[in-house]
Every structure is written in structure tokens, then in C-alpha cells.
Regions:
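Generic alpha-helix structural propensity
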Residues: 21, 44, 48, 60-64
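Short, aromatic/basic-rich helix-turn unit that serves as a nucleic-acid recognition element
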Residues: 48-52, 56
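A short, structure-level motif marking secondary-structure boundaries and short turns
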Residues: 12, 34, 51, 73-74, ...
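Intrinsically disordered, low-complexity, charged terminal extensions of DNA damage-control enzymes
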Residues: 1-44
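An alpha-helix initiation/capping motif
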Residues: 43, 47, 125-128
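Alpha-helical ds-nucleic-acid-binding substructure associated with the helix-hairpin-helix region
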Residues: 25, 29, 57-58, 62-138
């Protein structure tokens, strides 16, 4: 039987403690270094777009491309799916995003704008339902979801 668990700070810390009791090397390592705290991203749309941008390239290059991508939009306003749908795909390509990734980002924007992915209730869904919804978007696989 599989149990679905939402990975949060408490679950992660509990898991690390359990692993540490079974592995002295891990325990020593964790005593030396702090447990990483993963920030929780509330802008699901941008998080998914950013995941596509970062795929299969170095973090440094992806950060530069991501920053150039964001510069296409008004920095004072949260980028919306409508903004992405309105922008010409060539402009997206010109900041260093491949044609394929650009089309995936447009697909994500389309899914959010049509409420195929509803940001308002996504935090209430279990992991499997979120994965099912996200992977219904062309260009979003399990690893991205």
C-alpha cells in the first residue's frame, strides 16, 4: 500500500532524523552542516515556467536566461498566463529559450488561463492529483511536475 505524503518542512526534518539514526555518516554530516530549508513557491505558474527554463542547462546559464525572460514583462506586476500568451514567441526565443521550451511555456500559460490548472486549489490537492494535472500539459513530464 502506498501512502501519499506532502513534502513539507516537518516531513523532511522527520525523514532526515530517521535516516540519521540508521547511518552514522549521514548523522555526522548533518551535525556538521545544516538541514537545507526549501523555500515554498506560491506562484505556481511562474514556478512551472521556471522549471522548464532550467531543464537540461547549467544553473548559472538558466538563471541568466530566466532573468532575461522576466525582463520581457513589467517587473512591478506579477507575470500572468495572459502576459505570456500575448507575447510573441520570437521574443521568448530571443532571450535564449529554445523554440521547443518556448512552446512548452506557452502551453503552460494556456493551461493556467483555461483553468485546466487552477492555482487557487492546487495546494489542497494530493501529490498524485497535482502530477496528473501538470503532466496533462504538453512539455511537462513527471520530473517537472
Amino acid at each position: 500500500m502506498t501512502t501519499n505524503v506532502t513534502l513539507g518542512k516537518e516531513v523532511m526534518i522527520d525523514g532526515i532524523k530517521k535516516l540519521s539514526t540508521n547511518d552514522i555518516r549521514l548523522k555526522t554530516f548533518l551535525q556538521k552542516f545544516r538541514v537545507p530549508v526549501l523555500p515554498i513557491e506560491k506562484n505556481y505558474f511562474w514556478s512551472l515556467c521556471r522549471s522548464v527554463i532550467y531543464q537540461q542547462i547549467s544553473g548559472k546559464a538558466a538563471k541568466k536566461i530566466s532573468d532575461r525572460y522576466l525582463s520581457l514583462f513589467d517587473q512591478d506586476v506579477k507575470m500572468t498566463p495572459a502576459d505570456v500568451l500575448d507575447i510573441d514567441i520570437e521574443k521568448i526565443n530571443n532571450v535564449g529559450i529554445s523554440r521547443q521550451k518556448s512552446s512548452y511555456i506557452k502551453n503552460i500559460a494556456d493551461a493556467f488561463s483555461k483553468k485546466i490548472i487552477n492555482e487557487k486549489n492546487i495546494s489542497e490537492l494530493d501529490d498524485q492529483e497535482i502530477i496528473k494535472q501538470l503532466t496533462s500539459i504538453k512539455g511537462v513530464g513527471r520530473w517537472t511536475a
